[in-house]
Amino acid sequence: MTETIKTDVLIVGAGPCGLFAVFELGLLDIKTHLVDILDKVGGQCAELYPEKPIYDIPGVPMITGHGLTEALMEQIKPFNPTIHLNEMIESVEKIGDPEFRVTTNAGTVFECKVLVVAAGGGSFQPKRPPVPGVEAYEGKSVHYAVRKMEEFRGKDIVIVGGGDSALDWTLNLNPICKSMTLVHRRDDFRGAPHSVEQMRQLVASGKLDLKIGQITELQGEDGQLSGATIKLNGNSIAQIKCDAMLPFFGLTMKLGPVANWGLQLENNLIPVDTGTFETNVPGIFAIGDINTYPGKLKLILSGFHEGALMAQKAVKYVYPDKRVVFQYTTSSTNLQKKLGVN
């Protein structure tokens, strides 16, 4: 029989918002476990743009998704959270007021007083390009995210798409690849104007081959690409050499089992009280991109703010008889002791 894990708070999602929630809850002596469907912490930052620069974290002019994840992991070390990776929450059962029994697809069972949903936008899956047989190359020479730039050094790369991701990786990978082709169905790009301008400069200097059209066929064997056929606008055909393809057709968001937890939903998002970030179910909170409220901004810094306010309400469920006095880490010797800096 599976042993039940008892914890004060269970956090669903180990992205930046979920990790920072551990910090805010830890300051209040609240023990946490985290569950994430991915095989690593960091959420979208680690999975989709680990080496992409982030410029809007307060006080940090630039940091990568990987760097931010590492910094947050270092920040929460004093609170020693337990993290369960490669697991997805399958069921949530209310067994107290409030108390929940939560079961994962791996059979892990938790009992917690508070449940925090920090699952980003749910489960993100990249959209496949409409090219016959592309799945045979996925994971080996067709990649939907860049996890290590060095893997593309010296390669003949084809990037497909016209949005920010396609343009960003065109600019970032161009200096290290052997050759690069950018394919988009029209000569009109949705990315940031500055990125479009830089891309066109690469084309003008001969460092980037821009093809306006669509890939219709891939060549290769045993999962390794060797070339691609492009039907250009005007119906002429171009053949290119490539050993790596990066399609950026956007992501499909799937809310997954969260939709079956009895939470009020609004366009696949969870409405919350903006003073506490509690959902319509007492004891269940939602922070980060998964929630919605008037004026919502899908920014990491917004999720940090939401986590801080959530913790102030969560502590009342965990310690209902305890008088909690708000303290500052700059002046509280109690908090500094918890952080190991005093």
UniProtKB/Swiss-Prot annotation:
UniProt keyword list: FAD, Flavoprotein, NADP, Oxidoreductase
Database matches in InterPro entries: FAD/NAD-bd_sf, FAD/NAD-binding_dom, Fd--NADP_Rdtase_type_2, Ferredoxin-NADP_redctase_2
Record-listed FAD binding positions: 17, 36, 44, 49, 89, 124, 289, 330
Cofactor annotation remark: Binds 1 FAD per subunit.
Catalytic activity: 2 reduced [2Fe-2S]-[ferredoxin] + NADP(+) + H(+) = 2 oxidized [2Fe-2S]-[ferredoxin] + NADPH
GO MF terms, alphabetically ordered: ferredoxin-NADP+ reductase activity; flavin adenine dinucleotide binding; NADP binding
Cofactor(s) of this protein: FAD
EC number of the protein: 1.18.1.2
Subunit structure: Homodimer.
PANTHER family: THIOREDOXIN REDUCTASE 1-RELATED-RELATED
Family label: Belongs to the ferredoxin--NADP reductase type 2 family.
Record HAMAP family: FENR2
Protein name: Ferredoxin--NADP reductase
Organism the protein comes from: Rhodopseudomonas palustris (strain HaA2)
Source organism phylogeny: Bacteria, Pseudomonadati, Pseudomonadota, Alphaproteobacteria, Hyphomicrobiales
